[in-house]
């Protein structure tokens, strides 16, 4: 199956939001929807979408610039903020291609390193990152206490 990867536009917002819901199913829609226009307009943020042969959007990656990334030695750092491939087409190397596009964007922005994160229990994501040459930098546990 062939896919086309391109920069997201405002016309992609509804499909992009649908895929964000697939990535973060427990997040309120208001949280997932509130910053889409800002992200598309931000020169230090890039959203790339992938469509199948029928033109349907089936995957996306969001990348941004950060001053710091855990384990990184340079600044700014390209950062994979979100990465999603429809579960029915995983394993076809589309996720890898999206990461390569995001890495290319970060290089164009002057970055020498790319970073990312995932939940500790997301073994699929951890394996995908490792397969693409990423190294685990650290593990982090967040704490909270109600006062």
Predicted feature locations:
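Conserved N-terminal entry element of GNAT/NAT acetyltransferase domains
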Residues: 1-11
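Helix-loop element at the rim of GNAT/NAT acetyltransferase active sites that forms part
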Residues: 13, 17-31
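Active-site rim helix/loop that mediates acceptor-substrate recognition in acyltransferases
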Residues: 27-49
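Conserved beta-strand in the GNAT
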Residues: 49, 56-65, 79, 84
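A conserved beta-turn-beta hairpin within the catalytic core of GNAT-like acetyltransferases
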Residues: 67-80, 90, 137-138
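Conserved acetyl-CoA-binding loop-helix of GNAT-fold acetyltransferases
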Residues: 85, 91-104, 127, 131
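Conserved active-site alpha-helix within GNAT-family acetyltransferase domains
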Residues: 96, 108, 120-138
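Conserved GNAT acetyl-CoA-binding A-motif
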Residues: 106-118
